[in-house]
Amino acid sequence: LGWDVGYGFRPNDVVQQEARRTLLASTPEGRPLLQAEYFGAEHAHTLVWVQPQHARRSADASRGVDESALAWRGYWRQGALDLYGYGRWGRHTRASAGVAMAWVATDAWEIHASARALRHHDGWSQQASDLAAHPWQRTTLGAAMQSLVGAQWTGTEQHSVLIEYWHDGTTLSDDHWQDWNRRNAALAHPAATGLPAPARAGLLAGQATPMTASSLRRNNLFVRLAWQPEAWQASLDVLWPPADGGRLVTAALQWQGDAWRLNAAWRLAGGPSQSLLAQTPVRRTLLVAATRSF
């Protein structure tokens, strides 16, 4: 049950919470939920209870997509303009609310935007200052904002250009990432910890823990070029966080037949040596896949 209007990032995807910008597109795994919907010709309202079986779980046992929550979406159509409203009440993250819009301005241009305010959110926190201890813990943090604005141009030959800029206040701040870099530098020197090399290597590997977030930096620019002639689809996209100049470049090619789908993709993470994307554990990824539907 995917909600919201963005491509690279979706602030109001409060039920499915689907991973975005994956190398291989796949059918999202459904979430256990109860749903009620009312709709008319130009409007609709949806009420969802997601993960009802987790209603009595503790916060530590129900982080992220596992949290039991009530969610609402309202939809109103006004000509070429689609308007959305969202609300969510999570068992431990409590209230959040959001709005979104998508406007088909011309035959070629579409403009979209989305924003969400959160009272609490799940995120990574550095719990220990001791270099010899693993510091990263998943916990409930305070208020945050998420927002996105984007535009897409589509040509008559099935060429398209998508540009999106988003802010994700649920990921680590620039100050936290500076502390992260300083900790990496300290762990690289034996005298700073007094630990043997294998122990320091394990602690350095643990520093990759917060890199599982969907956005590493809070502000990101995303550009995607695509071309889809009949059964083929070729794309090139770039993710660029202005804070440190890192970059994530992905080139992909897909062929879709009646029963078979073939995919090839190449992803490269890089940038200045101190940028986060240049320090990810995996910086080059090649994917080749064949999928048959039955």
Where are these regions (language model features)?
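Extracellular loop and loop/strand-boundary signature of outer-membrane beta-barrel proteins
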Residues: 18-22, 55-60, 86, 130-138, ...
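Residues that define the transmembrane beta-barrel architecture of outer-membrane proteins
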Residues: 28-32, 39, 66-70, 93-97, ...
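Outer-envelope beta-barrel architecture signal
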Residues: 32, 41-45, 68-70, 79-83, ...
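Transmembrane beta-strand segments that form the barrel wall of outer-membrane beta-barrel proteins
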Residues: 20, 45-53, 78-91, 97-101, ...
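Detector for outer-membrane/organellar transmembrane beta-barrel domains
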Residues: 77-80, 102-238
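Outer-membrane beta-barrel "beta-signal"
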Residues: 223, 260-261, 266-268, 280-294
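Outer membrane beta-barrel
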Residues: 1-52, 271
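Outer-membrane beta-barrel translocator domains and adjoining extracellular loop/strand segments
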Residues: 7-11, 57-65, 95-100, 123-131, ...
